[in-house]
């Protein structure tokens, strides 16, 4: 019950068709699906089917089995099966269409700090629209459970001089989102918030996507080390999150 796994097609990588190193694809796929998008979708469907307990293989004739456990020709699921495991899967959506697809597949939604939708709106506004589309599609499909939706933000609360020394002085983050090209697509990149807790709270309350989501993920720069990451989390939990309505689990 404590596992939560995020999945997506993935961002560009240094390797050329890296999936081929693991036995997937070939010359035909390289021509028809050079970025591996269709391959990723196919494998994700297989992954979900396995999690949901669908038959993934056919039982051998009974006399050939060891140990002899299944009727010949029976459909075999992945065992042990954990009911509900598929409800703890999150799909990372980079477009509105991908978010709607996640709803149809019945998985939670992650929207990160980059979205390939550039209509002049801010990242928060674009993601709020993405979330709305996801929820409308979810309701239309008629799933019998309530999904979760997350957005990610790089946030560095500056509480004292040591924070400023590590992460930069208050107000030194970008003042606005930016437009760039990644994987041959134009996308909007979210700004980094480096500021005092009150300014961060003010900015997040104006962020329509943060307000629409039920989960806010912090992007922690792991290259800064464990201590720096822990400091970011502590400052956010102590000075920012309570102002957004969050209560620690220690309160029961």
Regions found by a protein language model. Give the residues of each.
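Active-site-adjacent structural elements that line small-molecule/cofactor binding pockets in enzymes
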Residues: 1-252
């Amino acid at each position: 019950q404590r596992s939560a796994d995020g999945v997506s097609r993935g961002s560009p990588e240094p390797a050329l068709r890296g999936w081929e190193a693991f036995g997937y694809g070939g010359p035909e796929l390289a021509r028809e699906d050079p970025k591996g998008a269709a391959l990723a979708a196919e494998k994700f469907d297989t992954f979900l089917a396995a999690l949901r307990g669908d038959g993934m293989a056919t039982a051998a004739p009974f006399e050939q089995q060891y140990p002899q456990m299944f009727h010949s020709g029976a459909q075999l699921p992945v065992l042990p099966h954990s009911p509900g495991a598929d409800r703890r899967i999150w799909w990372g959506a980079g477009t509105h269409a991908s978010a709607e697809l996640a709803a149809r597949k019945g998985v939670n939604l992650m929207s990160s700090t980059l979205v390939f939708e550039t209509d002049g709106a801010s990242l928060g506004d674009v993601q709020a629209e993405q979330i709305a589309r996801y929820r409308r599609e979810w309701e239309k499909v008629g799933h019998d459970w309530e999904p979760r939706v997350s957005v990610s933000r790089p946030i560095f609360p500056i509480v004292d001089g040591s924070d400023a020394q590590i992460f930069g002085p208050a107000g030194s983050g970008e003042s606005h989102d930016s437009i760039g090209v990644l994987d041959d697509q134009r996308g909007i990149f979210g700004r980094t918030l480096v500021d005092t807790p009150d300014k961060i709270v003010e900015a997040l309350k104006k962020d329509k996507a943060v307000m629409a989501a039920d989960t806010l993920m912090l992007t922690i720069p792991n290259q800064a080390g464990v201590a720096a990451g822990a400091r970011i989390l502590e400052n956010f939990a102590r000075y920012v999150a309570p102002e957004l309505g969050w209560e620690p689990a220690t309160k029961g």
